Amino acid sequence: MRRTMQLFRIQLFNLFPIHEIREPGNRKKRAAVILSIGGTAAALFLCAYNILTAGALAEAGEGALIPAYMVSISSFAVLFLTMFRACGILFGTRDMDLLASLPVKNSEIIGSKFLLMYLMNLMISLIFMIPGGIVWIADVKTDLPLLALFLSAAFFVPLVPMCLVSAISLLIVLASSHFKNRNIVSLLLSFAALGLVGYIAVSSMHSEGDMGNVGAILAKQITGLYPLSGLFLKSAGGKTGVGLFIVLSTAVFSLFIKVTSANYCRLNARAGAGSKYSKRRFPLKKHTPFSALFRKELGRFFSSYTAVLNAGFGVLLLCVFSVLLLVLPPEQLGEYAGIENINGFLSDYAPVVVAALLSLSCPAASAVSLEGKNVWILQSAPVAIKTLIDSKLAVNILLHLFGYLPAVCSILIRLHMTALQIAGLLWIPVCYSVFIAVLGLFLNQRYPNYDWDSEGMVVKQSLPVIVAGIAGMVCVAAPVLLSWFLSVPLLSVLWITAGILTAAAAIMYHKLCCLNYL
């Protein structure tokens, strides 16, 4: 256990540069402060939302369902979010050769990696469980042993979803390693798994039943989303059900660690193996400096399973939204989303929806860090700094085009919009796209991380990626909130915001082009 904690401590310091931040005058300190403020604000927002949701259940006379509901929602959130980072933390890392040479067991290695992932998911679990528990205690009189079991169960909630997703992710990587186009197969299988998770969530939320028995319908929806949450229902026996949940979670976790550690070296080698097929050979051609750098950036992005899965997720959602809008009637989409006048809603909020999903995809925020220890090649290349910057931004803009064009076409075909709304749909998402791309590259240039063990650390958990994501969401939410609270037309606020973002992007782009080296 002592060596497991030592390995965990080392990985934690690699993930979060605590020692560098503590140094006086370090540039990462400002980014860490922004990240802390943004993370705290997001956590408080989720806590407030969970309190309101639990309060709604209590007002409906279904306060006994609060524990099961919070377990179900938090487990689903952990399951969904872990799918983006499981393999990047557990398997296929560059530090395996170093770890294998140390006098540690495989169980200690995978235990430390799993503990790192558990710590991040525990925060999600507590954000749901603690606010819901407060409302539950205030609404339902419960005995002290049951309350202690409920609070203890919060620490066991992430275990089963993490083990399940880790096993699925490993199977995807192992299955795709037998194919020539490994990354394409991995992405297809991963997106299929995400689609299945989304389908289960939607199906569970539309369970039919006797409308006179609201409690039975809610219980069916909760257990449909996450079956183990049924152990927290009163019908499961109270303390017996919660205790059984803790025992099952511990047993699943122990079994996963035992099975995985027995074959960890072989599984890790297989996860990092390349295709057995030889690569195709292409004739050498001359290209302009920009074209050559752009092709290199584009090839590196699409050759990285982790980068495409995470940085391309927003664009994928936008493409799925476009297909659904073309295939299904807008009224049916409104029924699924709980929106009565879907045509009027989308006509007003279409620029916000497109901009929000584009803001989720920002490969430029990790483009510099992904150069790794080979960054000296770019820094010493006889190429203008503006060309280097343009090539990295072009990949981000091209990725956004894959989602922007289908979304705009589908919205224009299916919805009836005024000329001003059409102009906003065409221009406002472009401003957001340019801003988020320039902001991501600007942050990554100021706070790079060239010494990484796994691409997942750079693509998903680095300061520039997280700060750019938070900034993008703030820029999307701010106009909507201003429109709601100040009773100002949304489109007018969006046009003003787009102008501000365009000016900010121009300033950051000018500063990047004035650099001596990347």
Over which residues does each language-model region extend?
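Hydrophobic alpha-helical transmembrane segments of membrane proteins
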Residues: 1-96, 106-376, 385-518
